[in-house]
Regions:
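Extended amphipathic alpha-helical scaffolds
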Residues: 2-50, 58, 237-371
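Alpha/propeptide regions of enzymes that mature by internal proteolysis
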Residues: 3-10, 14-17, 31, 42, ...
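Glycine-rich, flexible beta-strand/loop modules in the N-terminal catalytic cores of phosphate-handling
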Residues: 18, 30-115, 120-122, 127, ...
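Small-residue-enriched alpha-helical segments and adjacent helix-cap loops
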Residues: 77, 81-83, 93, 97, ...
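Short glycine/threonine-rich loop-to-helix capping motif typified by GTGT followed
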Residues: 125-131, 244-247, 432-444
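Mobile "lid/hinge" segments at catalytic clefts and subdomain interfaces of large enzymes
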Residues: 145-264
């Protein structure tokens, strides 16, 4: 073992099973790395960052990849090529699970490229590789020299015979009436993703609090690991608008932006906000000829802070609605003549056309995943074209998959059993106009 001088192993119990972290044995050129072992599940997680900020951008370029290797389950990929190709739907959803809790903890103004890769190398059906990837990403970032205000902990929660269970086994998941993934720090919850069979709200809250107690233990364990093997954090240059520009733009534009944000109609509101931005840029063009990026950033911050303050302090939303007010709803069924079922759902300026197709049960989607081979009798696909927000077409593949999975998770618990209704069901939700209402696809799918 002399060749692995920095190799360290850390162990703890999570959900009654051994969680093992191995650091310093492989991937020595990555900024941060950990091999997570939980049961027989093994996930290698790396974190890498560029040395310099990415020029001419105003966002944080974080990329998260969850890579499934078929050898992890003792399988050879199907098809002619016999090689892993594009990520599966499960891999995309798992990447989003990892991304959501870690993204907010990077410092504001940090524009370096950061890539987190979780590679599933061995799979135990009883030990979730997604949870291993989430914990591993936290460890890799926390022990690296990349600036990050973690760590976070993550668990799954199920409920079997009325008892909450941390990281339920495959057998327990099959009889559980709740499937929840929770991630957080010691102080707060960062992310919740859940599906349940009509579980009351307070019982869901109990499950979140139950998960948080285990998360605190995981975070304390990771903090011990960081104290042992953590690298000093890089001294990085964080982008921040010049204070002089920030103050001047706020004094000039904040009252005007507030008035524009309160416009009830979305299209008119966007036009008014654009007018404020154009006016502000023209006003400061000669005063700060090189301050274009700073002005854009301050205008964005003004908008975000104004909307947040209106909601939290005054209890009103951008179109002057209160918390409990909803936009007018309009529905229509039987929109298309030759389809099996259609529902057009409209709420405010959101329009979603959901189209249902029935087929024999043999048409169910076969999923040959790394954990198990299953068939999906209900499929929900979500299309979000650029014209729905008045823009040129753009690629939103991951978002479409995520929103389709959200609607699918909401509808599956209330569908009839295969024995009572032996048909495959495919629903396609076409977003025709969008105004920030994600559940339009779910509502439209309930129409008939």
């Amino acid at each position: 073992m002399a060749r692995f001088e920095d190799y360290r192993v850390f162990k703890t119990a999570v959900g009654g099973r051994l969680l093992q972290l191995e650091i310093g044995k492989v991937c020595e050129q990555a900024n941060g790395q950990v091999m997570v072992k939980y049961g027989d599940t093994v996930v290698n997680v790396t974190a890498c960052a560029s040395k310099e900020p990415k020029p001419d951008i105003d966002f944080f370029p974080l990329s998260v990849d969850f890579e499934e290797r078929m050898y992890a389950a003792g399988k050879i990929p199907g098809g002619l090529i016999k090689r892993e190709g594009r990520p599966s739907e499960h891999a995309i959803l798992s990447s989003r699970l990892i991304d959501r809790p870690i993204r907010p903890l990077f410092p504001k103004g940090y524009y370096n490229d950061v890539v987190v890769v979780a590679t599933v190398m061995s799979v135990d059906p009883d030990c979730s590789p997604e949870v291993c990837g989430m914990i591993g990403s936290s460890v890799a970032l926390a022990t690296s020299d990349i600036p990050w205000d973690g760590p976070t902990g993550s668990v799954k929660v199920g409920r079997v015979d009325g008892q909450l269970v941390i990281n339920p086994t495959l057998e327990q998941r099959e009889v559980s009436d709740m499937d929840m993934t929770v991630s957080g720090t010691k102080e707060a919850i960062m992310m919740v993703e859940a599906g349940a069979n009509e579980v009351p709200e307070m019982e869901m809250l109990d499950a979140i609090l139950f998960a948080h107690e285990e998360i605190k233990k995981i975070v304390e364990f990771i903090e011990e690991v960081v104290r042992e093997v953590g690298k000093p954090k890089q001294d990085v240059v964080l982008y921040k608008p010049l204070e002089e520009i920030d103050q001047a733009v706020r004094e000039y534009a904040a009252p005007k932006m507030r008035e524009a944000i309160q416009t009830p109609d979305k299209l008119e509101r966007l036009e008014n906000m654009d007018a404020v931005e154009i006016d502000t840029k023209e006003h400061f063009a000669e005063i700060y000829p090189e301050g274009g990026k700073d002005i854009d950033t301050v205008l964005y911050n003004i908008t975000k802070e104004t909307v947040r303050a209106m909601i939290l302090d005054e209890g009103i939303r951008p179109d002057n609605r209160k918390h409990e007010e909803i936009r007018p709803i309009w529905c229509e069924t039987g929109v298309l003549p030759r389809t099996h079922g259609t529902g057009l759902f409209k709420r405010g300026q959101t329009q979603v056309l959901s189209v249902c197709t029935l087929a024999p049960a043999s048409e169910a989607q076969t999923i040959d995943g790394i954990t198990e081979q299953t068939s999906k009798i209900y499929m929900h696909h979500y299309n979000f074209p650029g014209f729905s927000v008045g823009e040129e077409d753009f690629e939103v593949r991951e978002e479409e998959i995520g929103h389709g999975a959200l609607a699918e998770r909401a509808l599956v618990p209330v569908l009839p059993s295969v024995e009572d209704f032996p048909y495959a069901i495919r629903v396609v939700s076409e977003v025709l106009s969008s105004n920030a209402y994600l559940m339009g696809s779910t509502c439209g799918s309930c129409l008939r």
